[in-house]
Structure formats: structure tokens, C-alpha cells
């Protein structure tokens, strides 16, 4: 919705008030999931807690107790993609999880759910992501890409259903 609202505004077709929010959703009472529960997820979760207490997590590399101590219900990837309203992809890349988020999982997502890719792009099969985001009503935002910088003729640049940022997260001087 943010992407389309931006385009509408530029083209003098913006909507205001309730009309502009008809297809929007609130975080309140949503199911929010983390794929990868490292430092980033641990910092992000407290910011989301005022909106919901329904958190799911998938991180097979961490002890179950750590996830449970952080009030996350442990779920399989299939269950996370079926149940979640918002999914944060925050995992590191390994030989075992390259392209693990593929068309099978993406097709399980609820209509109007959100997928936010903020860690390593190669955890997601971007070819599948482009196809699915065109066909299904899911919201996608990504700050990372399989190849950076993204080539000028890359098909991802033509996607109207994905919100992009050029790997800005974490790139600050300290």
C-alpha cells in the first residue's frame, strides 16, 4: 500500500482519510514471526510487543529454551507461513538454508500478509518471490538482494508489488 500510495500521490491520484486506508492493516493482535532469532530479532521484538503477544519463531540453530524464554512459540516453517500476518526474515545464510523460502512456502502465506527480508537475501529464492508476488496478494519489502548492487536490467526493478531499499540497514558510521 505504501508503494502504490506513493505512485498515486506523484500522479495526483492520492486518496485521503478512510478511503486511503481501506486495504491497510494494523499490527495490533497480529501473529508476527521471526525466521532467525539472533541479535536483530532480539532487539526488534520488544518494539513490537505493544501491538501483540502472539510471536512465532523458527531458528533450528538455537536452543528451544532461548526461544521459549523470549515468549516465542516454536513452529515449523510451514506453520509460520500459514499462520503469520507478518514474517521477518532475519536469519544468516548457511549451506542448509539457501533458498529455503521458496514458492512452496510463499504460496502458504495468508492474503495481505507481509514478508520483510532484512538479513541475507539468499535465504529467499528471489525468482519464486517475484512470480508469487505478482500472482498473490502478499506484501513484500526487502533491503537485501541476491546480487548487490542490483543490475540496471534486473527484472526485480520492474516489480510493482515489492517495496525496495538498497541495503541500507546496518550501514551507518559508528
Give residue spans per PLM region:
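Oxidoreductase and adenylate-handling cofactor-binding alpha/beta cores
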Residues: 1-7, 46-53
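Phosphate-binding beta-alpha-beta segment of Rossmann-like dinucleotide-binding domains, i.e.
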Residues: 1-31
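Glycine-rich adenosine-cofactor-binding loop
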Residues: 20, 25-49
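Short, well-ordered alpha-helix to beta-strand connector turns
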Residues: 30, 52, 84, 112-113, ...
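Proline-glycine-enriched beta-turn/loop adjacent to the NAD(P) cofactor-binding site
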Residues: 38, 143, 169
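Conserved beta-strand positions in the Rossmann-like core of class I SAM-dependent methyltransferases
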Residues: 56
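Adenosine-phosphate binding glycine-rich loop
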Residues: 146, 150-152, 157-174
Amino acid at each position: 500500500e505504501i508503494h502504490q500510495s506513493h505512485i498515486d500521490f506523484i500522479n495526483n491520484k492520492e486518496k485521503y482519510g478512510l478511503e486511503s486506508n481501506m486495504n491497510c492493516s494494523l499490527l495490533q493482535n497480529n501473529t508476527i514471526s521471526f525466521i532467525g532469532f539472533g541479535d536483530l530479532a532480539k532487539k526488534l521484538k520488544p518494539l513490537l510487543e505493544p501491538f501483540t503477544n502472539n510471536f512465532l519463531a523458527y531458528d533450528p540453530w538455537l536452543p528451544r529454551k532461548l526461544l521459549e524464554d523470549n515468549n516465542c512459540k516454536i513452529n515449523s516453517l510451514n506453520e509460520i507461513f500459514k499462520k503469520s500476518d507478518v514474517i521477518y526474515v532475519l536469519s544468516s545464510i548457511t549451506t542448509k538454508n539457501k533458498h529455503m523460502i521458496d514458492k512452496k512456502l510463499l504460496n502458504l502465506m495468508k492474503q495481505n500478509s507481509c514478508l520483510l527480508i532484512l538479513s541475507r537475501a539468499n535465504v529467499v529464492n528471489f525468482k519464486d518471490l517475484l512470480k508469487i508476488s505478482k500472482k498473490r496478494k502478499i506484501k513484500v519489502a526487502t533491503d537485501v538482494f541476491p546480487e548487490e548492487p542490483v543490475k540496471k536490467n534486473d527484472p526485480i526493478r520492474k516489480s510493482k508489488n515489492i517495496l525496495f531499499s538498497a541495503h541500507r540497514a546496518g550501514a551507518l558510521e559508528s
